[in-house]
Amino acid sequence: LDRIGLLVCTTEGIYLPKDRCDQIVHMIRGYFEDTGQELPETLTLEDFAAFFFPGSVMVDSVEDFEGAPIKFPLLTPPKQTQQLSVYLREALPQTVTPMVSGFGAIDLVRTGVNKATGLKDLCERLNADPAGILAFGDGENDMEMLRYAGWGVAMSNAPEVVRNAADEVIGSNEEQAVLDYVEQLLDRLEASQ
């Protein structure tokens, strides 16, 4: 935990090291400053964790968390996220894959585990055809899911590599494009019945 990430996500919960609280809050403030947003001066790590990671647990050491790690989320300076992702791909063992999961966020996950593998598992459990899945995405961590789904839709503000992985590109998150798309789809389905 001291050398890998600021958070550890397991099947049992999300764990935050107590001794890194000030560093984490400082990084969060830097992230929001880089995006032009302000945070209250009284923001604590507990406030942040409760909002972004409900159910998180503060721990004193790596020995205190339970369950097998499934991902290590990293907060990075937004302007350095892509560069850091490239560095991590080269520096980490092949069993770990860095996935850019947002502006200023990288998730370290087991290689071969992604949103598409989650959808595949769900399809197998429900005996569902992936061709019937409509998926939306805007980050590199969505690419495999967009390719796996019967129809993958990327947001216009997604990186080019994500837009290229999709079957269709619609407006941005700021334009509530997903809501509009789903409403239009439901209207078409209703009209066809």
Write out the residue ranges for each language-model feature.
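Mg2+-dependent phosphoryl-transfer enzymes with acidic/Ser/Thr/Gly-rich catalytic loops
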Residues: 106-193
